[in-house]
Amino acid sequence: MKNRNRMIVNGIVTSLICCSSLSALAASPPTEVKIVRDEYGMPHIYADDTYRLFYGYGYVVAQDRLFQMEMARRSTQGTVSEVLGKAFVSFDKDIRQNYWPDSIRAQIASLSAEDKSILQGYADGMNAWIDKVNASPDKLLPQQFSTFGFKPKHWEPFDVAMIFVGTMANRFSDSTSEIDNLALLTAVKDKYGNDEGMAVFNQLKWLVNPSAPTTIAARESSYPLKFDLQNTQTAALLVPRYDQPAPMLDRPAKGTDGALLAVTAIKNRETIAAQFANGANGLAGYPTTSNMWVIGKNKAQDAKAIMVNGPQFGWYAPAYTYGIGLHGAGYDVTGNTPFAYPGLVFGHNGTISWGSTAGFGDDVDIFAEKLSAEKPGYYQHNGEWVKMLSRKETIAVKDGQPETFTVWRTLDGNVIKTDTRTQTAYAKARAWAGKEVASLLAWTHQMKAKNWPEWTQQAAKQALTINWYYADVNGNIGYVHTGAYPDRQPGHDPRLPVPDGKWDWKGLLSFDLNPKVYNPQSGYIANWNNSPQKDYPASDLFAFLWGGADRVTEIDTILDKQPRFTADQAWDVIRQTSLRDLLRLFLPALKDATANLAENDPRRQLVDKLASWDGENLVNDDGKTYQQPGSAILNAWLTSMLKRTVVAAVPAPFGKWYSASGYETTQDGPTGSLNISVGAKILYEALQGDKSPIPQAVDLFGGKPEQEVILAALDDAWQTLSKRYGNDVTGWKTPAMALTFRANNFFGVPQAAAKEARHQAEYQNRGTENDMIVFSPTSGNRPVLAWDVVAPGQSGFIAPDGKADKHYDDQLKMYESFGRKSLWLTPQDVDEHKESQEVLQVQR
């Protein structure tokens, strides 16, 4: 039975009973767009030309996710206030200040006719359904529009592109904390002096750590460009000190439900600071993380290659990704993709498969531009005063007066911060600027690739810092750390802002330097947003460190344990890693510190309890508590340990950046991976002593023996936990971490009504979606088998009467139990599993 939002418009209704086989598609009229949905509501689009293929794509997206996409459009362009009111004015200003619309429009205008038809077809398809919705709102208007009091508007190619720019480029390739780092360095130098202060800064924010596990093994290759911290700080010494509140404190604060709080600037800073101290979501609130393992022909069993992807975007209702099959005009693909991009980020075409994780390469720099005191809007560049580019922006406000402001831009990029005390404007330079649309289309065009050379041609065009992964029907596997990266001047410390002029980039580094590997000796590729290659420099984010403590080791350890893996075993790695505590990192030090204590000493009891635990967090039958209190013990100990070490060494207020244990969250469930916190990584290096390659400029243990500090923190943990759970450690039942699929998108903007949030009792540290592609399986006669799980479900449609589409959350239980559903590719398979069918006649 068809859902009401899937009624046929502009075309022919073809019932399941009388429809013809999809194998007859070749004989269909050239104007025809055929839409077939499988048993989970996932659509497959069939058309003979690119425009109509993507017309069908946009059409089904509007059917399934119209309100989610509308709010994504407004979130990425800064027009939320127009429909939700003055609480979002500050948010809209921040968004508009961070992009340049004319650049995106110029990129679209320069596209070939074929590429333009991708974006135009998609927009026209959405508009076709929107017209029907507006004509019959009593039947087709998603209830969320009525709840929030506005109607959907037409889309254009710019809107389609901006969804990608705002949710991929600006979310995963635009993170920088160079100004925050400068604020930290200023405070550290004030406490320790210039030379020692810089050494302490290097201890807190190293650039390269030789002990960091890498996706490309050291025996395969290492990064050829070397960084010597002693010779890369010339420019940093020329930048004025920074005494204002760190910019990260001005990021919009969110409540427990992930919604923007819209509070005063002072209250916002207080809230953000408290959230950092208590466990900000992700790496200090930055998006994190994603994992991947690809098993090649020398390690796969009963198959030639196995790819398992787990991108961790956060958990949302409707789902963050959208499942789609595209067939025709040179495309024959199936998979899913964030925000229904017109290019699948996760999928396969029967011959190759692909997937992604965030790369966290450093593709953004901040330039400290000296402002003119006499000529407003002018800045100094190469000794001359240059007028900034500017544009006036007016924000329409529901039930309020419009607000107008100016966005400024230098030769380096948009001005994101101004320090009036030092007459300095901080401009953001992006290596991918001007390449946003080309990057989107690289994902689209890779869907046609049939081998490694063709696929890497598209990887070279993808300018964002994203890890790309490859497998093919012959069992070959590969990896590329894609992105465009600056060729910086000698003396440029990429962690800190640099002055203008002579510190301008020399250009972009050659793609030949991007880390990549094809058929590695290990037989597999694994990544959890760790370093791609030995000696590769990390992001400038103060909260992002590649070091000896890394979660990717959990994947590597499992894959190294046995010579070969079946598809089911590869899938089970999701379960094993998602429930695993990082006990292994600190247990040796804890055991050493308590070895000579009496067995009845509470501190010894805590460590003995940890030592008897395998590190896997399993939930009791009550669905609310863990079978073992291990994570609670480590959380309490690490929280105290960090306060006694890293936090104590860092001047206020910056100590709060390092106080979170990594176990807690400030929202009703995590927004990404509960990873090793930045403070824990710094502490881990200190506990390694001489084995750590990171110089310890300041003794984090304050001159005391480290075991004494460990025992004191254990005593704190005992005092905290025994008051809460009693004196019998064996009887402790600690609360399990829950998981929420939020009704607010990652910006904190509603993408659904609050009642649409879904909940899962047990948090699993795994992908927002998980997919697996298996090439040349020995069972059956198919050259490829594929599965995914996209929770809560394919649809986001809530009917005007409040009834949710049956595919809104029909993958929720599947996700919770580590299940998966098949992804169909061939016409025969799609035909056998179809639930509904539509045929449109599309004139152009």
Swiss-Prot record:
Entry cofactors: Ca(2+)
Keyword hit for Calcium: yes
Organism whose genome encodes this protein: Kluyvera cryocrescens
Signal peptide boundaries: 1-26
MF annotations from Gene Ontology: metal ion binding; penicillin amidase activity
Record-stated family: Belongs to the peptidase S45 family.
Highest taxon, organism lineage: Bacteria
Name listed for the protein in its UniProt record: Penicillin G acylase
Top EC group: hydrolase
